[in-house]
């Protein structure tokens, strides 16, 4: 059985928290650093199902779930900087997280994200990957590469159009007005509840204006710095999971991502984006089994 402890950590743009899950009866092999999904517009760090937390911690992988600031109050550059800061805090101040004996080195770590959280973890790792261009000096980088990356239905904006065109799936839902954006906090914040923030994501995908809510610079810089298109190699192995009929992120995006980085693949049937929310399904059980097998190959 795991324990749970929440701490405050320094944020670049606002106060933020991290929640640590650990099984005290199991020897820790490596630490999973987790970043939630939500299209950069909504979500909360403590969104992992109980089954995931129980299996990871029982297998010797304590997990730290981090906040990060949300759009449109912060843009993708700010968000990415904050995520990299969180990882570097784990590396430089391990005693904060009480995973290991005080004064000892941090455990090896694995980055884990779902949906937009996976996008952010992949971009973070790409900060020390091989590129076909020079990264700007004002973008931070990870101080040390992770042992691996877990990407559940993540993306790198490798396919054209899907993130800029209106989504056919979201257009089947009740139409949301642009006025919904006025209800979102204008100051940086890290929690985006479904009842207040999800409608903004629906509007963004219905209208095809999603990218404009988290990126405001020139188009060429978006593809250079905030996609994976020109990152030719990542410094660690990657495990990617996706459903064939994903309604948010097209399967073709998953195919390009896994081919580009020679990732271990888990393919689920069906159309649900976050298919692992159903923890009773055979697919989710197999996903967790294969994820832990992958983790064991790293450490």
Where are these regions (language model features)?
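N-terminal cap/lid segment of alpha/beta-hydrolase-fold proteins
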Residues: 1-27
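Short, surface-exposed "cap/lid" segments of acyl-processing enzymes
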Residues: 15, 24-56
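Alpha/beta-hydrolase active-site loop
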Residues: 74-99
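Primarily recognizes the serine-hydrolase "nucleophile elbow" in alpha/beta-hydrolase
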Residues: 92-172, 176
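Accessory cap/linker subdomain of secreted extracellular hydrolases
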Residues: 152-230
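Short beta-strand/loop motif that positions the catalytic acidic residue
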Residues: 234, 240-242, 246
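Conserved alpha/beta-hydrolase "acid-adjacent" motif
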Residues: 247-253
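Catalytic histidine-centered segment of alpha/beta-hydrolase-like enzymes
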Residues: 271-284
């Amino acid at each position: 059985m795991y324990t749970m402890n929440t701490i405050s950590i320094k944020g670049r743009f606002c106060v933020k928290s991290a929640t640590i899950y650990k099984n005290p009866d199991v020897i820790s092999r490596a630490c999973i650093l987790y970043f939630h999904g939500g299209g950069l517009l909504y979500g909360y760090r403590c969104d992992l199902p109980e089954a995931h937390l129980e299996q990871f911690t029982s297998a010797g992988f304590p997990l730290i779930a981090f906040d990060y600031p949300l759009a449109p109050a912060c843009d993708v550059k700010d968000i990415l900087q904050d995520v990299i800061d969180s990882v570097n805090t784990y590396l430089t101040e391990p005693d904060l997280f009480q995973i290991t004996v005080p004064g000892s080195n941090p455990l090896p770590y694995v980055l884990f994200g779902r949906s937009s959280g996976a996008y952010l973890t992949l971009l973070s790792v790409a900060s020390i990957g091989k590129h076909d261009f020079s990264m700007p000096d004002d973008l931070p980088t990870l101080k040390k590469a992770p042992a691996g990356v877990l990407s559940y239905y993540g993306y790198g904006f490798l396919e054209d159009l899907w993130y800029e065109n209106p989504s056919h799936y979201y257009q089947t839902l009740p139409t949301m007005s642009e006025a919904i954006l006025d209800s979102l906090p204008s100051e940086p914040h890290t929690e985006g509840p479904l009842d207040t923030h999800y409608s903004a994501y629906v509007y963004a995908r219905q209208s095809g204006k999603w990218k404009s809510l988290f990126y405001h610079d020139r188009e060429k810089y978006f593809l250079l710095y905030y996609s994976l298109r020109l990152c030719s190699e990542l410094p660690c192995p990657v495990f990617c999971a996706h459903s064939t009929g994903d309604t948010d992120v097209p399967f073709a995006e998953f195919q390009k991502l896994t081919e580009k980085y020679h990732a271990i693949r888990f393919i689920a049937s069906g159309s649900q984006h976050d298919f692992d929310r159903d923890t009773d399904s055979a697919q989710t059980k197999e996903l967790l089994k294969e994820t832990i097998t992958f983790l064991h190959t790293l450490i």
